[in-house]
């Protein structure tokens, strides 16, 4: 650098700021616009009830998630809630239990679970508008992967109005199935990125439209 100063006749005086040539660039040449360190926290209270009645018993968790993935085909509500609804449904499905005594003569089975609580969700969807408490019901037939039956889903989420109580909901899901967490998340139609600190953050690869200003023993232990 001193050679450049001599070449261009630049004198460095005490107390003056360094010339541009003497400073190191602080911004990378190629900036990572998908920085998992930049995220928001959605604090919310949630409630979800899930009942699945099928003509044949479920074999794997992947089979179940495949039946639930398209729950929102006819969804007309807030688009911002969509991913959060999908996440609480996922949380409920991870601990879905067979209802004792509901195997019928024809081999059909009923599975059920209810989960509720307060939590926070790290996400990269930007600022979310207020979530108002309302119960939304989704009921649809399933005919896929060799299963026939009916899914009943009742969900609600709402803001905590400034309170910050509850655990990381993504972490709860990860603890329930640590070996298959990311695989199951993708199978239900969600994405998550792991930050440098090991925290899972609800993420997206392709942006979706948004509204203007969204350990109990498992049924499938071996899956």
UniProtKB/Swiss-Prot annotation:
It holds the Pfam family Vesiculo_matrix. One of its GO terms (biological process) is viral budding via host ESCRT complex. Disulfide bonds: none annotated. It comes from the Viruses. A motif (PPXY motif) lies at residues 17-20. It is a peripheral membrane protein. Phosphorylated by host. Plays a major role in assembly and budding of virion, by recruiting cellular partners of the ESCRT complexes that play a key role in releasing the budding particle from the host membrane. Condensates the ribonucleocapsid core during virus assembly. Homomultimer. Interacts with viral nucleocapsid. Interacts with host NEDD4. Belongs to the vesiculoviruses matrix protein family. This is Matrix protein. It comes from Spring viremia of carp virus (Rhabdovirus carpia). The gene is M.
């Amino acid at each position: 650098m001193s050679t450049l100063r001599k070449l261009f006749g630049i004198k460095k005086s005490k107390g003056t700021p360094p010339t541009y040539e003497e400073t190191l660039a602080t911004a990378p040449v190629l900036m990572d616009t998908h920085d998992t360190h930049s995220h928001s926290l959605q604090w919310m209270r949630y409630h979800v009830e899930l009942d699945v009645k099928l003509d044949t018993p479920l074999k794997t968790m992947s089979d179940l998630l495949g039946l639930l993935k398209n729950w929102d085909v006819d969804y007309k509500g807030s688009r911002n809630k969509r991913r959060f609804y999908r996440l609480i449904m996922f949380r409920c499905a991870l601990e879905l239990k067979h209802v004792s005594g509901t195997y019928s003569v024809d081999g059909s089975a009923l599975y059920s679970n209810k989960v509720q609580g307060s939590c926070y969700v790290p996400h990269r969807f930007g600022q979310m508008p207020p979530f108002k408490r309302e119960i939304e019901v989704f009921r649809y037939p399933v005919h896929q992967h060799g299963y026939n039956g009916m899914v009943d889903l009742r969900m609600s989420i709402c803001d905590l109005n400034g309170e910050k109580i509850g655990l990381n909901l993504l972490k709860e899901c990860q603890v329930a199935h640590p070996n298959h967490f990311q695989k199951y998340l993708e199978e239900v139609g969600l994405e998550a990125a792991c930050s440098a600190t090991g925290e899972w953050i609800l993420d997206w690869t392709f942006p979706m439209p948004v509204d203007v200003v969204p350990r109990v023993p498992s049924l499938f232990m071996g899956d």
